Amino acid sequence: MSEERAARFGVGDDGLMDDRTTGESRHISAWINRSAADVYRYASDPSHLHEWAAGLAQGQLTRVGETWVAQSPLGEITIEFTPANDLGVLDHIVTMPSGEPVFNPLRVVPAGEQWSEVVFTLRRRPGMSDDDYTKDAAAVTADLAALKRILER
């Protein structure tokens, strides 16, 4: 990982997370009755994001260079996705309307041939209230439930 990219993803020189996180995180997951390849193929396509990630995007995304621009409940955001890979890694950086970058680890983990677990790591940002952290967790839970509904129909 280049130094610039590592810095964008919140990794310090020592390989540890920098001060953009409090060190508190929650793993929120959904089990989906579809292969990991199917889940990854759908979830990694930015054109589908507004269908299942209402907490992030409220309409179609527009590509601008290496990033995507979307309207979110908080205003206009930009999203930088991890390059396509065979490991199920869907990490992304959301740059908030304030300019604050937020790193979001997201994985599609195979569980046999027809099941997968989608795991989102929600990191508590400095200064985030208990109420806001709980609301973020609820939004992620709802987004993963929507992804499950779409892929299992």
Write out the residue ranges for each language-model feature.
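Generic signature of intrinsically disordered, low-complexity, basic-rich segments
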Residues: 2-3, 66-68, 112
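Beta-strand/loop substructures that line and gate deep hydrophobic ligand-binding cavities in soluble
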Residues: 94-153
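Glycine-rich portal/gate segments that line the openings of hydrophobic small-molecule binding cavities
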Residues: 31, 48-103, 117, 153
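Generic recognition of short, well-ordered alpha-helical interface segments
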Residues: 34, 44, 76, 139-142
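Conserved short-loop catalytic and cofactor-binding motifs
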Residues: 27, 65, 135
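Hydrophobic ligand-binding cavity/cleft-lining segments
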Residues: 2-62
